[in-house]
């Protein structure tokens, strides 16, 4: 079995550290990547960390993960609330997917309360800040053990 975990980040997450630090905190996406790589290594995973602002690229990465990864952590950003394409891409693969959000989407604007991705994912972690990514890695370790 593969030990690869692909961490996929959607639109605007490249702006972490600058964008609304009161909501998302001060960590950059690179900081979160470092946390994931280190935590993943401790769990026996090789973590590949990616970000794109383009929905089709995220779909392609999910398809790729279905071919070669043990699991996926995805923060779809705003696509969570609109993307049937991401929902369908997750349903198309057997690789377990954990959805992550830095903020608690249920405590924010009403349009953020519903995720189109969640029904297709194994589970969702939200509201724990950047540590949610590490939590997702631990969940995948449990799921894939």
UniProtKB/Swiss-Prot annotation:
A Pfam family reported for this protein in Swiss-Prot or TrEMBL: DHquinase_II
GO biological process, one term: quinate catabolic process
SUPFAM superfamilies assigned to the protein according to its UniProt record, in alphabetical order: Type II 3-dehydroquinate dehydratase
Keyword Iron applies: no
UniProt entry tagged with the keyword Nucleotide-binding: no
UniProt keyword terms in alphabetical order: Amino-acid biosynthesis, Aromatic amino acid biosynthesis, Lyase
Catalytic residue list: 24 (proton acceptor), 101 (proton donor)
Superkingdom of the organism of origin: Bacteria
Residues annotated to bind substrate: 75, 81, 88, 102-103, 112
EC number(s) recorded for this UniProt protein: 4.2.1.10
Reactions catalysed: 3-dehydroquinate = 3-dehydroshikimate + H2O
InterPro entries from the UniProt entry: DHquinase_II (IPR001874), DHquinase_II_CS (IPR018509), DHquinase_II_sf (IPR036441)
Pathway terms, separated by semicolons: Metabolic intermediate biosynthesis; chorismate biosynthesis; chorismate from D-erythrose 4-phosphate and phosphoenolpyruvate: step 3/7
GO molecular function: 3-dehydroquinate dehydratase activity
Positions marked as site (Transition state stabilizer): 19
Xref: HAMAP family: AroQ (MF_00169)
The protein's role, per its UniProt record: Catalyzes a trans-dehydration via an enolate intermediate.
PANTHER family: CATABOLIC 3-DEHYDROQUINASE
Stored NCBIfam families: aroQ, PRK05395.1-2, PRK05395.1-3, PRK05395.1-4
Subunit (UniProt): Homododecamer.
Family label: Belongs to the type-II 3-dehydroquinase family.
Protein name from the UniProt record: 3-dehydroquinate dehydratase 1
Source species: Agrobacterium fabrum (strain C58 / ATCC 33970) (Agrobacterium tumefaciens (strain C58))
């Amino acid at each position: 079995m593969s030990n690869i975990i692909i961490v996929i980040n959607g639109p605007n997450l490249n702006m972490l550290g600058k964008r609304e630090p009161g909501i998302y905190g001060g960590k950059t996406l690179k900081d979160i990547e470092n946390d994931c790589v280190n935590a993943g290594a401790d769990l026996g995973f090789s973590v590949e960390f990616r970000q794109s602002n383009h929905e089709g690229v995220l779909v392609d990465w999910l398809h790729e993960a279905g071919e070669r990864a043990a699991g996926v952590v995805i923060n779809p950003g705003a696509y969570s609330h609109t993307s049937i394409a991401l929902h369908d891409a997750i349903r198309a693969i057997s690789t377990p997917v954990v959805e992550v959000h830095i903020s608690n989407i249920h405590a924010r604007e009403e349009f953020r309360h519903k995720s189109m991705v969640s029904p297709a994912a194994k589970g969702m972690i939200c509201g724990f800040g950047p540590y949610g990514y590490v939590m997702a890695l631990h969940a995948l370790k449990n799921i894939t053990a």
